[in-house]
Amino acid sequence: MDTETGLYYYGARYMNPVTSLWYGVDPEIEKVPGCSHFAYTFSNPITLIDPNGQSAKVTVNAHSKTIVVSATLVFYGECASAAIATQTAADIQNGWNEAHGTVKLGNTTYNVIFKIKGEYRDVSGWLGLKRAELKLEMAKNTDPEINYIEVVKYATKGSIPGISNFDIGGNRGEFQYNNIQGSGTTTEAHEFGHGLGLKHPDRDLRKKGQPGIMAPRNTLVDPKYQYNPKAKPDSRNGGTLNPAKRKVTQEDIDNLKINKLHFKDGKAYLGHAT
């Protein structure tokens, strides 16, 4: 409870415990347009829980001047494996840490460190019982640090078939195996950025230098970042972004708006549990 106002604080908004009314709209209401702006868990608190209206955990350490963004990625599906879980988590962690990002809170500059853990869940077996068990776990999950990613031969859940996808600001994704095959690929870090709430930037980044990690395929970029540096800037002859040449930049870190989060006991959250 907030001692000054007498209201309950839930990280994203306040609730009056006397009237049971929320003060302020749900910050993720744009993702659920059919729900009241002031509702809690779709007005269904029996089966749903929303601990803070927001998903990776962000922890501030004032002593070491670091901000740690942590998440656990649970991989399952026809192409998932323990090796994929380990490799993909490492690619995401390394990709985001490559920026050596910083955030300023007040008058203090903090180094941003990403700590990503990968877990594999085998959902094969008789009668699909393991898959059903995982689906139940996903439905009941309220921990915004835990993300569930299905690894498939061909992705179908996104806006474009055949492309890996992740809920914007959410904690569920679908990775197409050939998009993430091999170490050092950038699709994983790109999709994780969506999970943190980031969207695609302008599709024309010519004369803007290094493309950030959120630049999508078919983006127009400076020649050295194209599939074919000698091609004209179009999608016919390799004249668009080679995804292998995008990377996390300080601008991507800035776009997370960590400095705008409301920290309680040194912790806050990016995104939300879906």
PLM features per residue range, with description:
Residues D2-L7, G11-K57:
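Short turn/helix-capping motifs enriched in Asx and small/polar residues
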Residues Y10-G11, S36, V69, L198, ...:
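Residues that flank catalytic or metal-binding motifs in active/ligand-binding sites
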Residues I29, P45-I46, H200-D202, L220:
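Acidic glycine-/aspartate-rich tracts in secreted/extracellular proteins
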Residues Q54-H63, T274:
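Extended, hydrophobic alpha-helical membrane-active domains that insert into or remodel lipid bilayers
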Residues A62-A85:
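Fold-level signature of zinc-dependent metallopeptidase catalytic domains
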Residues T72-Y76, V152-Y154, L198, P216-T219:
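Active-site-proximal beta-strand/loop segments in catalytic clefts of secreted hydrolases
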Residues A83-D204:
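Metzincin-family zinc-dependent endopeptidase catalytic domain
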Residues I168-S183, D202-T274:
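Metalloprotease/metallohydrolase-associated module, dominated by Zn2+-dependent proteases
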